[in-house]
């Protein structure tokens, strides 16, 4: 591949080996990075380029980082590829989602065990038959974190999409028939929630041989709203962030024990 940037510097993230830790939290929103970095010790801004912001600090004596991915699979896959090239190998995606399963309420936490590949990025990495699955170690660490912190937590499959408004206003789309029929299938299959990055992260992680898991704050659930059930709308992501940070602590402790 032709080198488009300074030697050793990743083209999009503007980082190089040594800038990030082995463990990285991946929010979508660049503005969440500083908030997450507050949970680290001695956190410092490493890079800020396009939608990609990176801070590095320490957690329980281990070098850790947070890097934003932007929205969707293409930018998330770029972030993961360049972080792995810079030395990272364990990742926790943290963000927001919309509930699908009727039992999932706004303010709850969802932990993805796998993702439905209704986006386009992963088709350039693997045949459509290949599953997008989270790493077992990371899922376990997230579940343990959610339990320890006392949050209402749901683990299961999430739907990963490219069009935000294709979910929320499918009836106005030219392919409304397909979107609405598939949405009914996801409901019958008890899919927990809908979001936009996990499928890409899981498939790219399988390709690169690294560990990735995802956790989300549920903003709300349109199915509960349609059914006339309580449907709180929650935007504060601190609960999901604390789950992600605690999961990193769990992984650090587990990896040290297994070393």
Question: Where are the regions that the model predicts?
Answer:
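Metabolite-binding pocket within alpha/beta catalytic cores that recognizes anionic/polar moieties
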Residues: 1-141
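Conserved active-site and cofactor/substrate-binding residues in soluble primary-metabolism enzymes
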Residues: 27-31, 71-78, 86, 104, ...
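Flexible, glycine/charged-enriched surface loops at secondary-structure junctions
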Residues: 43-48, 150-157, 253-259
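Short acidic/polar active-site loop segments enriched in Thr and Asp
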Residues: 89-90, 192, 211
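Active-site rim beta-loop-alpha module in soluble metabolic enzymes
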Residues: 132-190
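Generic non-transmembrane alpha-helical segments
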Residues: 141-149, 204, 243-254
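Zn-dependent metallopeptidase/amidohydrolase metal-coordination segment
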Residues: 199-233
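His/Asp/Glu-rich mid-to-C-terminal helical/loop segments that flank catalytic regions of hydrolases
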Residues: 222-259
